[in-house]
């Protein structure tokens, strides 16, 4: 009767099917295939069940359709029931099509053990079945098993991997972040003659990019004759991920010159590059491009624009984009709130968080709470900290170790080490971040001994190992407390026992540690021996130490190098001016001041905030508009006199140098 050809839709087919008094197996199969084409999986299983009630036995055409429906609906129990039916029939049990469909069903339901068992029962699995198994392991979070199964496939004499199998294999290598394995697969691809398959080559490019094989990715990209938008976007992302944002923007310009139209992924990568390079001009051009292509309304693009403008220090433009987002998600709020804090506007971060809760009914996630607690830390208001702590407990975030660490840091910044310690003790699973937060808190308040006790307790009484950040915190704590011998011991411990390579920040703290006690010669020697060129931060620390210990000759040497690296930093000129002033070299003081004026260098406006009785008071240097300026300046003069008296009574101590 031409049942299959007569009806183009499953609705017509079902209507006609329902009017039949007697149905053949062919008609049942036709109906199920029609429903499958339209992805009406529930209907497939519903009619499959009715087929049994009509005592119509399914065949090797019926069962694969039903098993596909089970896989799509993750109905593993139903699928196992069908598997039981198949086992009772020798003909169906040996059918490759039915066996492959059972494997597909188990893979879709995440049951790889059953899928593997079923695969091993097949007499001669074809390339599709082999590829399904490789894909199944890769998609179910077992990339290593996917690679091992591919090895088994290659060893089989009766099957040859195709491009689909290889793309899946490359995806597994990408998830493993194994560039060495990626290179092996790349060689296999070339030997098998797939080197001109653009989809496969793009997958390899993505593998190299995400495995930090930067040179291999760039070289492969250059070898692609006909690059598409995926090729360009992948290599742009690779440059960004490897800290080469400026180069990423140059590649994007090459892409535009090549005539390749960017897509959403390209725009997102370029915006990340603009943010990392702080390239506001290119960011604005990319924004215009997004508007022309109608992409600005997509929440991912809008959020990336907010992030870019914030990191390019243009919060006004960031907020303008944010206000136009029709449906703001929690990621958008994270970009806005963290962006305001980055731009020194932590108070705006708190305000926007309140607006989010009251007006937008958006519930924050753990990431947003960490950002908000960070904003609160910048302000250092204790009462506000307690309010946020209550919010954290109310919404069940207190068990999150990252939020716990943020609370420890928050209370420390607010001067409440007691509350910081209570939060720390209440965290059941303390990781490195939590331990480091408490050590940092003690260090901020000059409690170096307590910081050392906490560090030693961490090392001896827990399974948590200190990382680079932990060592930076404990070194800073030792520096602030003048614990020179302990600081040097910690530095050696990091290098010799934990085999951690010090970075520039570690060396900066080490120089500060030596500079505070006047061991300037050793500090200079450290800057010469370290595997990095001295940064302005390190040289500025040295210059400050030279001023404190009145070493004018060394100060001039350091300042010369410092001004070459950063010639527009007002603070460094002030330091050198103070050195000359102490020596009575007023001509040099005048020369420096004239140089600052000629360069148009201005010192940033100093500002202080203090919270008293839940009210925030803001003080600005040389402020003549404060309503209580007279008592404020009177108190400052009185404090200044007390500080001078204390300074005169200070006891200085000598330090006997320790070798590194």
UniProtKB/Swiss-Prot annotation:
Keywords carried by this UniProt record: Repeat
Region annotation (Type E(+) motif) ranges: 614-644
Keyword Membrane attributed: no
Swiss-Prot/TrEMBL PPR repeat ranges: 24-58, 59-89, 95-125, 126-161, 162-196, 197-227, 228-262, 263-297, 298-328, 329-364, 365-399, 400-430, 431-466, 467-497, 503-533
GO molecular function: RNA binding
Type E motif as annotated region, ranges: 538-613
InterPro entries assigned: E_motif, Pentatricopeptide_rpt, PPR_At4g14850-like_plant, TPR-like_helical_dom_sf
Pfam families: E_motif, PPR, PPR_2
One BP term from GO: RNA modification
Similarity comment: Belongs to the PPR family. PCMP-E subfamily.
Name of this chain's protein: Putative pentatricopeptide repeat-containing protein At3g01580
Source organism per UniProt: Arabidopsis thaliana (Mouse-ear cress)
Gene encoding the protein: PCMP-E87
């Amino acid at each position: 009767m031409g049942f299959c050809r007569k009806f183009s839709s499953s609705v017509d087919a079902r209507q006609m099917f329902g009017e039949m008094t007697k149905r053949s197996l062919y008609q049942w199969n036709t109906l199920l295939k029609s429903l499958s084409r339209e992805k009406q999986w529930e209907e497939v299983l519903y009619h499959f069940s009715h087929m049994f009630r009509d005592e119509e036995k399914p065949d090797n055409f019926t069962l694969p359709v039903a098993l596909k429906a089970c896989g799509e609906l993750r109905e593993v129990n139903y699928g196992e029931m069908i598997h039981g039916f198949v086992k009772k029939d020798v003909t169906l049990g040996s059918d490759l099509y039915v066996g492959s469909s059972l494997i597909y069903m188990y893979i879709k339901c995440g049951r790889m053990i059953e899928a593997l068992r079923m695969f091993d029962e097949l007499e001669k699995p074809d390339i599709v079945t082999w590829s399904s198994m490789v894909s199944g392991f890769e998609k179910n979070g077992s990339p290593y098993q996917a690679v091992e199964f591919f090895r088994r496939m290659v060893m089989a004499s009766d099957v040859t991997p195709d491009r689909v199998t290889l793309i899946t294999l490359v995806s597994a290598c990408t998830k493993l972040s194994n560039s060495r394995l990626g290179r092996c697969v790349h060689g296999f691809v070339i030997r098998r003659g797939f080197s001109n398959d653009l989809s496969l080559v793009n997958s390899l490019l993505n593998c190299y990019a995400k495995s930090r094989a930067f040179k291999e990715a760039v070289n492969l990209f250059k070898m692609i004759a006909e690059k598409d938008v995926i090729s360009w976007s992948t290599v742009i992302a690779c440059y960004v991920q490897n800290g080469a944002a400026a180069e990423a923007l140059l590649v994007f310009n090459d892409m535009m010159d090549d005539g390749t139209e960017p897509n959403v992924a390209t725009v997102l990568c370029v915006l990340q590059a603009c943010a990392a390079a702080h390239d506001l001009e290119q960011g604005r051009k990319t924004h215009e491009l997004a508007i022309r292509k109608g992409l600005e309304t997509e929440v991912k693009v809008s959020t990336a624009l907010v992030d870019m403008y914030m990191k390019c220090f243009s919060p006004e433009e960031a907020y303008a984009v944010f206000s136009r987002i029709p449906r703001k998600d929690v990621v958008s709020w994270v970009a806005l709130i963290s962006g305001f804090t980055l731009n020194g506007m932590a108070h705006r971060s708190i305000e926007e968080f309140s607006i989010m809760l009251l007006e937008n009914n958006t519930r924050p996630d753990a990431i947003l709470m960490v950002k908000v607690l960070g904003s609160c830390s910048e302000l250092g208001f204790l009462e506000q900290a307690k309010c946020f702590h209550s919010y954290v407990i109310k919404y069940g975030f207190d068990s999150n170790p990252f939020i716990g660490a943020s609370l420890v840091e928050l209370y420390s910044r607010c001067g409440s080490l007691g509350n910081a310690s209570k939060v720390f003790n209440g965290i059941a699973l303390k990781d490195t971040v939590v331990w480091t937060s408490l050590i940092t808190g003690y260090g901020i308040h000059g409690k170096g001994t307590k910081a050392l006790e906490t560090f030693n307790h961490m090392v001896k009484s827990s399974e948590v190992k200190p990382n680079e950040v932990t060592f930076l915190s404990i070194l800073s704590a030792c520096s602030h407390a003048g614990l020179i011998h302990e600081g040097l011991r910690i530095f050696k411990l990091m290098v010799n026992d934990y085999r951690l390579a010090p970075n520039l920040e570690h060396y900066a703290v080490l120089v500060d540690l030596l500079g505070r006690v006047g061991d300037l010669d050793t500090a200079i020697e450290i800057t010469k021996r370290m595997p990095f060129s001295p940064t302005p931060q390190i040289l500025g620390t040295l210059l400050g130490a030279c001023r404190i210990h009145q070493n004018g000759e060394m100060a001039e040497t350091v300042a010369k190098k410092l001004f070459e690296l950063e010639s527009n930093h007002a603070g460094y000129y002030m330091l050198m001016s103070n050195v000359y002033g102490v020596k009575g070299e007023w001509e040099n003081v005048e020369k420096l001041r004239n140089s600052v004026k000629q360069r148009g260098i201005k010192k940033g406006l100093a500002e202080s905030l203090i919270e008293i009785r839940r009210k925030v008071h803001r003080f600005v240097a040389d402020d003549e508009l404060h309503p209580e300026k007279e008592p404020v300046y009177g108190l400052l003069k009185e404090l200044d006199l007390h500080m001078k008296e204390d300074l005169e009574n200070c006891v200085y101590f000598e330090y006997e140098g320790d070798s590194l």
